Amino acid sequence: MILVYAEIINSRIDYVFRLIFNQVLKSDIEFTDRSTKFQQSDLPKINYSYEKFENEFYIKPHRLLHCQALIQPDIQPVWYEGEKHFFESSNDSDLPFDPFAASFYLVSRYEEYLDVEREKYKRFPAGQSILSKYGLLKKPVVNIWANVLAKKLQEKYPKLKFPAKKFDFRSTIDIDNAWAVAHKGVFRTGGALLKALFKSDVY
């Protein structure tokens, strides 16, 4: 169990903390907005507020998670341990970036709600995304940030353990088209085959 302190526990903070700890790191958290309870607790703890207390794990929050209105943050990458991170934090924070604001920005697709140029069908082009801008489209950045956070927490609280991740391989076969062929009939199937031959679209 990890105790999280925030001055205001709003829906954004609740969502992104549970995403990172419950879904990605498979760990339990508890929130409190009572500073006395937080400081007296013996649990591993995260102070996500604008005031650092003592020697707890501290991250000064970016204002993104506290704003009710949409804002257009100026996002510059923060280099840390060979990776790019977003939303720079303070010098007295245990991480140089805010993994919670950064993760919320991405998983909520926040940038798609801003006044940005769209393609002809009014869709948000991936090439305009912050991940594309910094060459991160193919990286699981939220998982990377969560792992960085977990590592730093374990340095502060050596007894804190996170469950080992389990992976499995599930092979699937898309048979939609094969099923469709079974019901097209001889003439339609033959015509499609001839068309494919003329186009050299046969494998």
Please describe what each predicted stretch is.
Residues 1-203:
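Terminal accessory/targeting
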